[in-house]
Amino acid sequence: MDLGSGLYLPIHSTHLLEHGHAAIKRVIVVVHGSGRNGNDYFERTIAPAAAMDLLEETLIIAPTFQTSEDGPSKDEPFWTSGGWKRGHLSSSSGPSPRVSSYTAIDRILELVLDSERFPILEQVTITGHSAGGQVTHRFAGTSRIENETAIPFRYVVANPSTYLYVGSERDSQAGFAIPNSAACADYDDWHYGLQDLNNYATAVSRDSIKVQLVRRDVRILIGSADSLNASLDVTCGANMQGRHRFERGQTLIRFMDAFDPGHGHQEVIVPGIGHSSTQMYMSEEGRSALFGS
């Protein structure tokens, strides 16, 4: 994928983006987890599309955000293992200019929103599971691409470790309140909250992030059995969001209810499923979130 300025991002795609496709009605951009295995997530998103006989009208794109360990080519930007998840700029030891991982997603979306390439496009969905879910939720609050089109967008956030909070309050026995942060001074910093924003988020502004994340169509897709701590962020800022992924998803919805009852987040629980992107996306609830109305 050509990002411009001589930079390229590895992607998997069901159709050639540059040439377009006249039959495409739906675009799904799926972001991999911490393993940076975009190819696996590509296949895991194709499976439900095929099961619903929607593959011919669906363009699935799976980018790969590399680190130095992945052996990127000299014209491929790479990030730290945490940086790509948070929308940080690519490494200064990689090619120039440095680019935010979220800007790279913006470039993909700009291409697919070209009506000459995809003239009957009806829906754009950004999704990710685990670390990809973190990217999806933060991207939903910070990207301005949706504002530039009338085509509906949806963000399907599956089993992330943490979420972006648009207020400084966190859950407590007394309800949502600003915590005593003496022992956890950075609990509300980016990427948990809206303090100390990175370059990409700063360009948007806190007020705009709040409005965007509150108003957009965001599906919080959580497995009821995702209650183990494997690969879970257990820093103090993360623990203020809940004990495990399932609880953190439910708590985020309760926060949004308290913050703005007219918000666009919807809780979608997948019964009996744990931390499995394959099972989440193939479930009835997952397929409805990805392909339903």
Residue ranges and their predicted role:
Residues 221, 233-234, 250-293:
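C-terminal catalytic histidine-bearing segment of alpha/beta-hydrolase fold enzymes
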Residues 32-36, 161:
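Active-site glycine-rich loops that stabilize anionic/oxyanionic intermediates
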Residues 65-99:
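Cap/lid segment of the alpha/beta-hydrolase catalytic domain
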Residues 150-258:
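The feature captures the conserved acid-bearing segment of alpha/beta-hydrolase catalytic domains
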Residues 128-132:
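Gly/Ala-rich beta-loop-alpha elbow adjacent to hydrolase catalytic centers
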Residues 1-27, 35, 39-59, 84-93, ...:
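A domain-start/cap signature at the N-terminus of enzymes
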Residues 45-46, 133-146, 284:
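Short glycine-enriched nucleophile-adjacent loop
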Residues 28-33, 62, 220:
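Structural cue for short, hydrophobic secondary-structure segments
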